[in-house]
C-alpha cells in the first residue's frame, strides 16, 4: 500500500505525441541540503524553487525539531533561521523521515557530533534499508547507535560529546555516506577527510563552500580526497534551487520513446556528477539537445529538448558512469526496451538496496510486459524490441518506490496495451506534480480506482 494511505493504482496508455514544456520540480538533493545547511548556519537562509515533495517536507520538519525556524512564505520562498554548527537541540519526539534515505542519512550526520539523542524511523521501505553504512563511519567520531539487527530503523543515535575528526575511505560510492561524514565533521575540531574511489554527486562540497566552510578537493592515487576543517561559522545564503535532473529524466525519456513527441524541459541542473543518464541517452542515439547552457549558483544548467528517437541502439553503459546516474537506471531500462538490440548495465549493486531492490523490480515488471531481461548481483541486461515493441497489458508492483512507479507509467505511454502500476502514491515523495505535468504534455493516465 501507499506510504500515506490506501494504494492508488494508475494505468498509462498509448495516446498521442507528448508535446510542450515540462516544468519539473526543484532538485531533491539540493533541496535537502539547503534546509540542513541553512539550519546549521547563523542567521536567515532564503531558498526559492525548493522541491515540496514529502521527502523534503520531512527534512524541513526535522530541522524544526532540531530548533531551527523553518517557514514557507506565501510566494513559495522558504526561510530558515539557523542555530549554528553544534546548536541543534534534542527533539521532543521520534523523527519520521518517511521514505527518504537521503534525508535520514544526512540528518544522522548533522546531529552525530552534537551531544543529543535522536530516534529515527521511516516508512516500511526505509525501515528495510541498511543504515550501518552511515552509522559505522559516524562511530569513528564517537557517535553511538542503537537499533534493530543489520542496522535498520527504528534507530537511536547518541551524538559524540567530545568528537574527534576522522579520515574515512568510503567502501562503496555513496554521496549520502560522504555527506553524512562531512556533516558530522562540521562540529569536530581539526580536519575531517573523506576519500572516495569513484566520484559521486558533489552538491555537499559545492554548497558547504558557498556557506563559508573551509573545504577542498583533490584527486590523488587514492581517489577523490575531500578535506573539511571543522567548527566553522556557516554564513546564511540565498539559494535558487535548480530543477531536478532525476525528475527531468521522466518527461525526457517518455518523449524519446513516444512517437511524434517533442518536449522542452527548462532549467535543468547538469552537474557532471548527475548527468550520466543524458550522456547515455545520447550515446544510444537519442535526439536530446542542451539549449541555452549557463551557470546558476555554481551549478551548470541548461534547457533540455527531447524528441521521439526511433533509431536508438542498445549499448554497454560504462560502469564508471553508474554513480552519476544511479537513480536513473530504472527509466533507462524502459528506454532500452524501446531501442534495437541489447543494453548492458554493470556495476550497479547499489540498486539492490534503494527504496526497493530496483534491479528485481524493473526486471520483473519488464518481463511481465513482454521484454526479455537477464540480471545478476550487480548487473542487468535488457533485450530491446525497438520502438513501440513493449507489449504491455500487465500490472506491475512498485514496492513503495517512486522511481519504479514513474518508470512503468512512462513505459505505458509507448506500450501496445498500456501498463498499470499497483500504487501511484509514492510518486509524491519526489515528484508531486508528475501526473498533471504529464497530462499537460498529452499523456494518457487513468486512475484505476477512479
From Swiss-Prot:
<protein>
    <recommendedName>
        <fullName>3-phosphoshikimate 1-carboxyvinyltransferase</fullName>
        <ecNumber>2.5.1.19</ecNumber>
    </recommendedName>
</protein>
<feature type="binding site">
    <location>
        <position position="101"/>
    </location>
    <ligand>
        <name>phosphoenolpyruvate</name>
    </ligand>
</feature>
<feature type="region of interest" description="Disordered">
    <location>
        <begin position="1"/>
        <end position="25"/>
    </location>
</feature>
<keyword id="KW-0028">Amino-acid biosynthesis</keyword>
<feature type="binding site">
    <location>
        <position position="358"/>
    </location>
    <ligand>
        <name>phosphoenolpyruvate</name>
    </ligand>
</feature>
<dbReference type="GO" id="GO:0005737">
    <property type="term" value="C:cytoplasm"/>
</dbReference>
<feature type="binding site">
    <location>
        <position position="129"/>
    </location>
    <ligand>
        <name>phosphoenolpyruvate</name>
    </ligand>
</feature>
<feature type="binding site">
    <location>
        <position position="354"/>
    </location>
    <ligand>
        <name>3-phosphoshikimate</name>
    </ligand>
</feature>
<feature type="binding site">
    <location>
        <position position="29"/>
    </location>
    <ligand>
        <name>3-phosphoshikimate</name>
    </ligand>
</feature>
<feature type="binding site">
    <location>
        <position position="33"/>
    </location>
    <ligand>
        <name>3-phosphoshikimate</name>
    </ligand>
</feature>
<comment type="subunit">
    <text>Monomer.</text>
</comment>
<keyword id="KW-0057">Aromatic amino acid biosynthesis</keyword>
<dbReference type="InterPro" id="IPR023193">
    <property type="entry name" value="EPSP_synthase_CS"/>
</dbReference>
<dbReference type="GO" id="GO:0009423">
    <property type="term" value="P:chorismate biosynthetic process"/>
</dbReference>
<feature type="binding site">
    <location>
        <position position="28"/>
    </location>
    <ligand>
        <name>phosphoenolpyruvate</name>
    </ligand>
</feature>
<dbReference type="GO" id="GO:0008652">
    <property type="term" value="P:amino acid biosynthetic process"/>
</dbReference>
<feature type="binding site">
    <location>
        <position position="403"/>
    </location>
    <ligand>
        <name>phosphoenolpyruvate</name>
    </ligand>
</feature>
<feature type="binding site">
    <location>
        <position position="176"/>
    </location>
    <ligand>
        <name>phosphoenolpyruvate</name>
    </ligand>
</feature>
<dbReference type="InterPro" id="IPR013792">
    <property type="entry name" value="RNA3'P_cycl/enolpyr_Trfase_a/b"/>
</dbReference>
<dbReference type="Pfam" id="PF00275">
    <property type="entry name" value="EPSP_synthase"/>
</dbReference>
<feature type="binding site">
    <location>
        <position position="174"/>
    </location>
    <ligand>
        <name>3-phosphoshikimate</name>
    </ligand>
</feature>
<dbReference type="GO" id="GO:0009073">
    <property type="term" value="P:aromatic amino acid family biosynthetic process"/>
</dbReference>
<dbReference type="GO" id="GO:0003866">
    <property type="term" value="F:3-phosphoshikimate 1-carboxyvinyltransferase activity"/>
</dbReference>
<keyword id="KW-0808">Transferase</keyword>
<dbReference type="InterPro" id="IPR001986">
    <property type="entry name" value="Enolpyruvate_Tfrase_dom"/>
</dbReference>
<keyword id="KW-0963">Cytoplasm</keyword>
<comment type="function">
    <text>Catalyzes the transfer of the enolpyruvyl moiety of phosphoenolpyruvate (PEP) to the 5-hydroxyl of shikimate-3-phosphate (S3P) to produce enolpyruvyl shikimate-3-phosphate and inorganic phosphate.</text>
</comment>
<feature type="active site" description="Proton acceptor">
    <location>
        <position position="327"/>
    </location>
</feature>
<comment type="similarity">
    <text>Belongs to the EPSP synthase family.</text>
</comment>
<feature type="binding site">
    <location>
        <position position="327"/>
    </location>
    <ligand>
        <name>3-phosphoshikimate</name>
    </ligand>
</feature>
<feature type="binding site">
    <location>
        <position position="176"/>
    </location>
    <ligand>
        <name>3-phosphoshikimate</name>
    </ligand>
</feature>
<feature type="binding site">
    <location>
        <position position="28"/>
    </location>
    <ligand>
        <name>3-phosphoshikimate</name>
    </ligand>
</feature>
<dbReference type="InterPro" id="IPR006264">
    <property type="entry name" value="EPSP_synthase"/>
</dbReference>
<dbReference type="InterPro" id="IPR036968">
    <property type="entry name" value="Enolpyruvate_Tfrase_sf"/>
</dbReference>
<comment type="pathway">
    <text>Metabolic intermediate biosynthesis; chorismate biosynthesis; chorismate from D-erythrose 4-phosphate and phosphoenolpyruvate: step 6/7.</text>
</comment>
Amino acid at each position: 500500500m501507499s506510504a500515506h494511505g490506501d494504494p492508488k493504482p494508475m494505468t498509462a496508455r498509448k495516446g498521442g505525441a507528448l508535446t510542450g514544456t515540462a516544468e519539473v520540480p526543484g532538485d531533491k538533493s539540493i533541496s535537502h541540503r539547503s534546509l540542513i545547511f541553512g539550519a546549521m548556519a547563523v542567521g536567515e537562509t532564503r531558498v526559492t524553487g525548493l522541491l515540496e515533495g514529502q521527502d523534503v517536507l520531512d527534512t524541513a520538519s526535522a530541522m524544526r525539531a532540531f530548533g531551527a525556524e523553518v517557514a514557507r512564505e506565501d510566494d513559495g520562498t522558504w526561510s530558515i533561521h539557523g542555530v549554528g554548527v553544534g546548536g541543534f537541540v534534542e527533539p521532543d519526539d521520534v523523527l519520521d523521515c518517511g521514505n527518504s534515505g537521503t534525508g535520514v542519512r544526512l540528518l544522522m550526520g548533522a546531529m552525530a557530533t552534537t551531544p543529543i539523542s535522536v530516534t529515527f524511523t521511516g516508512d516500511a521501505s526505509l525501515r528495510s534499508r541498511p543504515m550501518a553504512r552511515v552509522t559505522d563511519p559516524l562511530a569513528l567520531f564517537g557517535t553511538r547507535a542503537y537499533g534493530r539487527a543489520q542496522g535498520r530503523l527504528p534507530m537511536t543515535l547518541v551524538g559524540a560529546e567530545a568528537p574527534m575528526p576522522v579520515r574515512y575511505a568510503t567502501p562503496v560510492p555513496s554521496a549520502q555516506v560522504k555527506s553524512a561524514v562531512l556533516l558530522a565533521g562540521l562540529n569536530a575540531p581539526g580536519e575531517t577527510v573523506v576519500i572516495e574511489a569513484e566520484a559521486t554527486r558533489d552538491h555537499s562540497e559545492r554548497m558547504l563552500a558557498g556557506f563559508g566552510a573551509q573545504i577542498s578537493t583533490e584527486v590523488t592515487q587514492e581517489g577523490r580526497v575531500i578535506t573539511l576543517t571543522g567548527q566553522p561559522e556557516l554564513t546564511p545564503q540565498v539559494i535558487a534551487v535548480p530543477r531536478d535532473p532525476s525528475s527531468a529524466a521522466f518527461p525526457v525519456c517518455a518523449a524519446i520513446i513516444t512517437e511524434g513527441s517533442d518536449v522542452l524541459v527548462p532549467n535543468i541542473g547538469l552537474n557532471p556528477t548527475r548527468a550520466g543518464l543524458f550522456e547515455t541517452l545520447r550515446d544510444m542515439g537519442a535526439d536530446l539537445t542542451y539549449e541555452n547552457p549557463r551557470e546558476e549558483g555554481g551549478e551548470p544548467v541548461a534547457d533540455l529538448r527531447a524528441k521521439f528517437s526511433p533509431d536508438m541502439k542498445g549499448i554497454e553503459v560504462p560502469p564508471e558512469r553508474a554513480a552519476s546516474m544511479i537513480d536513473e537506471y530504472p527509466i533507462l531500462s524502459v528506454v532500452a526496451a524501446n531501442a534495437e538490440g541489447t543494453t548492458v548495465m554493470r556495476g550497479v549493486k547499489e540498486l539492490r538496496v534503494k527504496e526497493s531492490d530496483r534491479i528485481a523490480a524493473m526486471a520483473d515488471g519488464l518481463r511481465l510486459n513482454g521484454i526479455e531481461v537477464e540480471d545478476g548481483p550487480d548487473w542487468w541486461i535488457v533485450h530491446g524490441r525497438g520502438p513501440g515493441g513493449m507489449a504491455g497489458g500487465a500490472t506491475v508492483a512498485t514496492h513503495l518506490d517512486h522511481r519504479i512507479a514513474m518508470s512503468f507509467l512512462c513505459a505505458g505511454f509507448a506500450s501496445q496495451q498500456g501498463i498499470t502500476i499497483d500504487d501511484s502514491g509514492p510518486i509524491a515523495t519526489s515528484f508531486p506534480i508528475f501526473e498533471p505535468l504529464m497530462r499537460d504534455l498529452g499523456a494518457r493516465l487513468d486512475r484505476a480506482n477512479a
